[in-house]
Amino acid sequence: MAETEKERLLKQLAQLKNERTSFESHWLDLSDFINPRGSRFLTSDVNRDDRRNTKIVDPTGSMAQRILSSGMMSGITSPARPWFKLATPDPDMMDYGPVKIWLEVVQRRMNEVFNKSNLYQSLPVMYASLGTFGTGAMAVMEDDQDVIRTMPFPIGSYYLANSPRGSVDTCIRQFSMTVRQMVQEFGLDNVSTSVKGMWENGTYETWVEVNHCITPNVNRDSGKMDSKNKPYRSVYFESGGDSDKLLRESGFDEFPILAPRWEVNGEDVYASSCPGMLALGQVKALQVEQKRKAQLIDKATNPPMVAPTSLKNQRVSLLPGDVTYLDVISGQDGFKPAYLVNPNTADLLADIQDTRQTINSAYFVDLFMMLQNINTRSMPVEAVIEMKEEKLLMLGPVLERLNDEALNPLIDRVFSIMARKNMLPEPPDVLQGMPLRIEYISVMAQAQKSIGLTSLSQTVGFIGQLAQFKPEALDKLDVDQAIDAFSEMSGVSPTVIVPQEQVQGIREERAKQAQAAQAMAMGQAAAQGAKTLSETQTSDPSALTAIANAAGAPQQ
């Protein structure tokens, strides 16, 4: 009997499960000690409120993860300020007014879609998973109400595979849906016989395991435009139930899963290193140290006691101010601690603080909390800015990978969805068929460009100082180019800078006005001179009369 499509998908799922097995023990440790609620290795864990933080005594690792997630959110994709802009591959085209305006309008509309959707609720969750487990995943789906709808996946609930380029192009997610949700989403005719029976019996809230498989559609017919022949194939199917029944088969024009990795080794699908993995050993050591400190204090304040046998079955009190009576017999020491504990916790506290600092360094806490931890009031503003820029550069490699594996696909996906929904204005003719370039202008992206800004500012300042003694030094500075370069590196809105052709028109008009004013001034001066000559008295001897007489005398 031929293999059904569902059986083939289940076989692929089993292979991906086997590939992921070696990572799971590490992820479980990270989950137990840093982010207990950030994983889901069993679909049956849905809506389970079991206590999971039993291995955490000191939550320094968990708080460091929170700071990293919040810092990346505010520093990379802050909803409070623009963090990306669209540009053309040809920089000269950016000086063309209609292109500038169109790109600005598109960027503003995309930001409105981001703010309206739940994107900014999902990104911190993905950043937390990325920092602790090294791998994050989030789906970006079309939505009739908010244009897009995002859903972050907990670690352990999905399986990934790479394309030949090394980027993720396959994702199978396992999750749970209630019988009611399945019937509402897929229809009663598409669910399995067992789910249909539960629906008819009224057990609407029973959970059923569902799989969602997204893979490249290698067998598609590119000449057809239906959902089953799109570049990426999407299939929903139950783990159990009928062996030949799929819940839904459709497709995507773009890969809808964002799957950034912190650091990847070779051909690995999942991350090989991240702050959580670096800090895990210290996080475990910190729990032991905190237990030892508590035991030390406990033994000092409530020590084990020794007593003579005469006190056996007698009333003994350890309450403050209470009295225990006993007969002291020669050779007996009475009722006393078994051993004296000197609670000198200074060395232990110093080691605990050192361990905490190591954990915070692994999570870049010192970077995100720099202005809070350092007294910057006594420092020059330039020194504070340079220190901040230097620390932000430490995240440079991670930021580049995040751009490539998460932010670029996110913007491409949302742009395409908005284009299909006719939410974008008609582009200028010069942009027809031209790919756009994405530039990031977030706080961290600006830190990467700050070296160029500083160099440009220093160069312009140097030329200005020279011009005080040698004004012709300004001839060496192209002011228009300096303004354009500075505004581009600063991330200023393109509409703030006047296009070059408009500047040229303004200058030509100003030159014409200056010429007209000069001609008018010369005309007025000539008229005034003629008037003066006409009013001059020639009866008295003067130079003027001499000239006039000489001009009128007959020539010999």
From Swiss-Prot:
Keywords: Capsid protein, Viral capsid assembly, Viral genome ejection through host cell envelope, Viral genome packaging, Viral penetration into host cytoplasm, Viral release from host cell, Viral short tail ejection system, Virion, Virus entry into host cell
GO terms classed as biological process: symbiont genome ejection through host cell envelope, short tail mechanism
Subcellular location: Virion
Recorded GO CC terms: viral capsid
Disulphide linkage map: none
Region: Disordered, residue numbers: 527-556
Biased amino acid composition, Polar residues: 533-542
Coiled-coil spans in chain: none
Chief place where the protein resides: virion
Entry-linked InterPro entries: Connector_podovirus (IPR020991)
Assembly and oligomerization: Homododecamer.
Record's function text: Forms the portal vertex of the capsid. This portal plays critical roles in head assembly, genome packaging, neck/tail attachment, and genome ejection. The portal protein multimerizes as a single ring-shaped homododecamer arranged around a central channel.
Similarity remark: Belongs to the podoviridae head-to-tail connector protein family.
Name of the protein: Portal protein
Organism field: Salmonella phage epsilon15
